[in-house]
């Protein structure tokens, strides 16, 4: 966390917002990607206030970042054979493996002023601080690891990504609470360092 924006200052900024909550609903992967784009645009346009959305996956999916190459990141044949759809999100970051009942994601759609004074890297830690605190409250010894991971002593448990548009931020974090780690090397082409 940056000294320019202490945690209590961020908590104050977040508490001042009139949050809109999107009910927790399972949808197919492509629908979730479309919802992120539409909701961010509606917040930007002033048609809705700052919004938090918790979402469940109705199908297994591999979600790649906006600048990634499907061919370089994903074994397409293995994904097809194992029943995973492949979709692209509007934010950056790496490929996420998402499974119904094993993965939950949340999105925050907020004005960028919430993280003003923070570097791009620091904004990840700031917007995920409540999740790290929630893990701790549940007895999970979670910590933040730059640039966009939440980890426990057993490894990565969540990854975040952001998109910024016209003074607003979409920040979403995917929590893999019961993922089958044996699927990662079968589906995602990553180095061993990313699997730890």
Where are these predicted regions, by residue range?
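Glycine/serine-rich anion-binding loops at beta->alpha junctions
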Residues: 83-103
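Active-site loop/lid in soluble adenylation, ligation, and acyl-transfer enzymes
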Residues: 2-85, 89, 196
């Amino acid at each position: 966390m940056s000294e320019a924006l202490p945690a209590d200052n961020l908590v104050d900024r977040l508490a001042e917002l009139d949050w809109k909550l999107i009910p927790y609903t399972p949808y197919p992967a492509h629908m979730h990607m479309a919802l992120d784009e539409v909701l961010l645009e509606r917040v930007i346009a002033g048609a809705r206030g700052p919004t938090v959305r918790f979402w469940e996956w109705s199908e297994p999916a591999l979600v790649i970042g906006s600048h990634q190459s499907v061919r370089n990141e994903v074994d397409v044949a293995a994904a097809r054979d194992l029943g995973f759809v492949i979709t692209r999100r509007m934010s950056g970051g790496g490929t996420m493996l998402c499974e119904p009942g094993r993965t939950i994601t949340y999105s925050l759609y907020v004005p960028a002023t919430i993280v003003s004074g923070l570097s791009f890297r620091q904004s990840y830690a700031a917007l995920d601080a409540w999740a790290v605190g929630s893990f701790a409250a549940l007895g999970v010894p979670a910590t933040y690891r730059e640039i966009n991971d939440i980890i426990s002593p057993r490894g990565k448990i969540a990854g975040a990504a952001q998109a910024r548009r016209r003074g607003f931020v979409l920040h979403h974090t995917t929590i893999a609470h019961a993922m089958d780690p044996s699927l990662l090397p079968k589906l995602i082409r990553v180095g061993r360092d990313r699997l730890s």
